[in-house]
Regions:
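Structural signal for the C-terminal ends of transmembrane alpha-helices
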Residues: 14, 85-93, 165-167, 210-215
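Interfacial segments of alpha-helical transmembrane regions
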Residues: 26-31, 86-114
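Aromatic-anchored segments of alpha-helical transmembrane domains
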Residues: 37-43, 109-111, 179-187
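Membrane-helix interface segments
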Residues: 58-60, 93-95, 168-173
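Hydrophobic alpha-helical transmembrane segments
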Residues: 71-87, 151-154
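Hydrophobic alpha-helical transmembrane segments of integral membrane proteins
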Residues: 103-124, 185-200, 204
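Membrane-embedded catalytic cores of phosphoryl/pyrophosphoryl-handling enzymes
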Residues: 130-222
Length: 222
């Protein structure tokens, strides 16, 4: 059982790699335009940071602290363990696979985000180095591991997978709203630039969708 799940993790990792390369090759012009638009948002980063710095109050502190908690791995690991172990104990493959999808999305998006963080070494906004300051090829300290956001990656990976559990619009809106709250909170707490959270959200949403789709295909084949 665990061997099969680990094999699925490996296959999903390959699927993400080839899907990305294939998508870029088939849509070179669109991919280039998206990259240009994304890079242009870097010029907006200081404006967004300044705006968030002016809205601090007790209400927003409370709201964005919820997002701060949601972006930590506690909920992800708790959900994974409860569903995965519960599925095994009650011989329910659907529940077990649901837990494993949460774990997969967390691991795969985490690897991608960590690699990019270490390559780029972007300084966090609170360090006051500016939005175009990078310290390439680094493993730390945390002050220059800003792009992409790890917390936002965790939040969107979890939300994408969990939102796929049920085909219900309200259910999906709730979970993605929580992820967006995490993203906004990271800017509010001056931990990340807007471009940091955008890239993390895109990466984890794509990873989560690949995990969901591959799981659905595997279920149909079995």
């Amino acid at each position: 059982m665990l061997k099969k799940d680990l094999l699925n993790l490996y296959e999903d990792a390959k699927s993400i790699h080839f899907s990305f390369i294939g998508l870029v090759k088939r849509n070179i012009l669109i991919s280039t335009l998206i990259l240009i638009v994304y890079l242009s948002i870097f010029f907006v980063d200081p404006i967004v940071r300044d705006w968030f710095s002016k809205i601090h109050n007790n209400f927003f502190d409370f709201v964005f602290n919820i997002g701060h908690w949601y972006g930590k791995p506690y909920l992800t690991f708790t959900s994974f363990l409860l569903l995965y172990i519960g599925g095994i104990l009650f011989s329910n493959n659907r529940i077990r696979e649901s837990g494993w999808k949460i774990f997969e999305a967390f691991v795969l998006s985490g690897i991608i985000v960590t690699v990019i963080k270490s390559i780029l070494g972007r300084w966090r906004p609170y360090t006051e180095h500016g939005n175009f300051a990078f310290y390439f090829l680094t493993f730390g300290p945390n002050d220059h591991l800003s792009l992409p956001s790890g917390d936002v990656a965790i939040a969107f990976a979890f939300s994408t997978v969990v939102a796929g559990f049920f085909d219900n619009k309200a259910w999906k809106i709730f979970w993605f709203s929580m992820a967006v709250l995490t993203a906004l909170g990271r800017i509010y707490h001056d931990q990340h630039w807007l471009t940091d959270v955008i890239l993390a959200a895109v990466i984890s949403t794509c990873v989560g969708n690949v995990v969901n789709n591959n799981s659905r295909v595997n279920s149909e084949l079995t």
